[in-house]
A protein has these predicted regions:
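Blade-loop segments of beta-propeller domains
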Residues: 2-9, 23-68
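Repeated scaffold domains used in trafficking and secretory/extracellular systems
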Residues: 7-9, 53-58, 96-103, 143-148, ...
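Blade-level signature of beta-propeller repeat domains, shared across WD40, Kelch, NHL, RCC1
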Residues: 278-335
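Hydrophobic beta-strand positions that form the internal "hydrophobic ladder"
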Residues: 19, 65-66, 110-111, 155-156, ...
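Loop/turn-rich, solvent-exposed surfaces of beta-rich toroidal or solenoidal domains
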Residues: 206-208, 222-261
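A flexible loop/linker signature enriched in serine peptidases of the S9 family
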Residues: 4, 23-33, 70-75, 92-96, ...
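Asp-box/WD-like beta-propeller blade repeats and closely related beta-sheet repeat scaffolds
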Residues: 47-118
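Conserved blade-ending motifs and adjacent loop-strand segments that build the rim/top face
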Residues: 186-188, 223-233, 260-284, 320-328
């Protein structure tokens, strides 16, 4: 079973030359995950890790390092050379906690990972200095999930519950200060909007929209509507969104936020069921020229890359009288 990193995290190296994925050795709940890399065109596949306890992978925003936890110890691996290195031990009285991905600050100074507090088994956010000098607990929550570092350096976000037991998304600074509830309750599968302070996501339940919101706003701004958008990856300049769809599954949609128009890029043929590995979870390469997604179209989840032609993007970004209400364009026909 193989998949790329989630919509919130980079799966390509900063120079866009290399794709990094994770692969489970056998399809079993407790089976180990290994990290692999290949060229952006799918060639030169190589294995980067083979430890049974590796988890919570994160790719650096700049350079060629990937970070991961073994238990509560931080490790790094060079995507180019395969060199692995133990970086920093974990904080005391914290147990391991495995999740999909960790995350790294865009300047590369910090890695944020998961653990569980020994005293009450609550999930904790661990911040490691990547120079190996410190590992500290920043926050705790009984339902900790979805650690995500803002590509613009505006802090990190994570999922949890409030005092009433309701699911919420929190934000805080890299040092753990300014813990607050983010205004993302109406956004499904949200992410930071590139390097900006805004957030972008699909509509909740019956709302067939992609919309954005910023801290301090009461209401979100609808970008496009019409398809049942599901997960939204976004370009670092926050001009483009790539979204998968469901009910029905219409494939990947490319959205230009400025023009408020969208069109289908490709079909994904994933089953889009309850298991996470049946979801496409699309994301862009840093240059926006490729979209990476996961599909179980063969019966087992694998990673796919779709080129996003510049001509196609120019067409989507140009106001078009043929766009339907809500911004959907007809199928693209390259000349």
């Amino acid at each position: 079973m193989s998949n790329h990193f989630y919509i919130e995290h980079p799966s390509f190296t900063s120079d866009c030359s290399t794709l990094v994925i994770r692969s489970q050795r056998v399809p079993a709940r407790a089976a180990p995950w290994d990290l692999y890399a290949c060229d952006a065109d799918g060639l030169n596949l190589r294995q980067l890790t083979d430890e049974d306890d590796a988890n919570n992978f994160a790719l650096a925003h700049e350079g060629s390092l990937a970070w991961y936890q073994r238990g509560t110890t931080l490790w790094s691996v060079d995507v180019g050379t395969g060199e692995r290195r133990e970086v920093c031990g974990g904080p005391p009285d914290v147990l391991p906690m495995g999740y999909w991905c960790g995350c790294a600050s865009p300047d590369g100074k910090f890695y944020f990972g998961y653990g569980r507090r020994r005293s009450d088994d609550q999930g904790v956010v661990i911040r490691y200095r990547t120079d190996g000098t410190e590992a500290v607990v920043l926050a705790a929550d009984p339902h900790l999930c979805h650690l995500h570092a803002s590509p613009g350096g505006h802090g990190i976000s994570f999922g949890g519950v409030n005092e009433r037991g309701e699911g919420v998304q929190y934000g805080m600074n890299h040092d753990g200060t300014n813990l607050r509830v983010l205004p993302t309750a109406t956004l499904s599968h949200f992410t930071w909007a590139g390097t900006t302070k805004r957030f972008v996501g699909a509509g909740m339940w019956e709302r067939r929209v992609i919309h954005t919101i910023e801290e301090g706003q009461r209401d979100s701004s609808v970008v496009v509507e019409g398809s049942f958008f599901w997960h939204t990856g976004i370009s670092w300049d926050a001009e483009w969104t790539v979204a998968d769809t469901n009910w029905p599954n219409e494939g990947l949609m490319i959205v230009n936020i400025r023009a408020r128009q969208y069109a289908r890029l490709c079909l994904t043929d994933n089953t889009a069921g309850h298991p996470q590995w049946t979801h496409a979870h699309p994301a862009f390469s840093p240059d926006g020229r490729r979209a990476v997604y996961t599909s179980d179209r063969t019966g087992m989840c694998q990673v796919y890359v779709a080129d996003v032609p510049e001509e196609f993007k120019a067409w989507v970004a140009t106001p078009n009288p043929d766009a339907a209400p809500g911004g959907r364009l007809p199928e693209w026909r390259p000349e």
